[in-house]
A protein has these predicted regions:
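Zinc-dependent deaminase
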Residues: 1-21, 85, 89-164
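Short, basic and Ser/Thr-rich N-terminal targeting/leader segments
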Residues: 22-26, 72
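Short beta-strand scaffold segments in enzyme catalytic cores
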Residues: 26-34
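Short secondary-structure boundary/capping segments
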Residues: 28, 67-68, 117-119
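A short acidic/small-residue loop/turn micro-motif
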Residues: 44-46
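Helix-adjacent hinge/juxtasegments
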Residues: 51, 56, 60-93, 97
Length: 164
C-alpha cells in the first residue's frame, strides 16, 4: 500500500462513519509532513448546516493544529471530488496537492463540471484524481441505494396508513 493509499483509506473510513450517521459518505484528511493533521466527514444533516462538508472540517482542524491558515505544506485527501465551496477553501488555504477518489458529475469543481484549480487564482493546487476510486464509488452507491429503498418504504407505509 502506498502512502497516498494509506491516507485515502483514512478518509474512506471517515466516509463510512458519515454513512453510519446517515450522512452522505464523504471523508477527508489533511496531511502535513507525513502525518494527519486534520480529519473531517460530512455532517450537513447532523449539524443542520450547508457548511458541514468533510473538507471544511478537515481544513479547520488542520489550521487549528498547525496554528495558521496557510497550509502550503499540506496535502488533502477526500473521497469525493470537491464542490465549488470546498475547492475555494482549498485554494484559500493554499493546499499543495488534492487527491480525490470518486468524481462528482453534479457538483465537482476539480474537473467534472468545472475546474477552479485552473482559473487564474493566486494559488493552484496540484490535483490527483481516481485514488481508490472504486471503493469510494461503491460506498456512495451503497448509501444512495439504501436511501432510495428507505424512501420507497416510507412512501409505501404512508400509502397504507392513508388507505386504512
Amino acid at each position: 500500500m502506498t502512502e497516498q493509499e494509506k491516507f485515502m483509506k483514512a478518509a474512506w473510513k471517515l466516509a463510512q462513519k458519515a454513512a453510519e450517521e446517515g450522512e452522505v459518505p464523504v471523508g477527508c484528511v489533511v496531511v502535513c509532513d507525513g502525518k494527519i493533521v486534520g480529519r473531517g466527514r460530512n455532517r450537513r444533516e447532523t449539524k443542520k448546516t450547508a457548511l458541514g462538508h468533510a473538507e471544511l472540517e478537515a481544513i479547520q482542524k488542520a489550521c487549528k493544529k498547525l496554528g495558521g491558515w496557510r497550509l502550503h505544506r499540506c496535502d488533502l485527501y477526500v473521497t469525493l471530488e470537491p464542490c465549488p465551496m470546498c475547492a475555494g477553501a482549498i485554494i484559500n488555504a493554499r493546499i499543495k496537492t488534492v487527491y480525490y477518489g470518486a468524481s462528482d458529475q453534479k457538483a465537482g469543481s476539480c474537473g467534472s463540471l468545472t475546474n477552479l484549480f485552473e482559473l487564474p487564482y493566486n494559488h493552484k493546487p496540484e490535483l490527483v484524481s481516481g485514488l481508490m476510486e472504486q471503493e469510494c464509488v461503491d460506498e456512495l452507491q451503497k448509501f444512495f441505494k439504501a436511501l432510495r429503498a428507505r424512501k420507497r418504504a416510507e412512501k409505501e407505509h404512508r400509502k397504507q396508513l392513508q388507505s386504512e
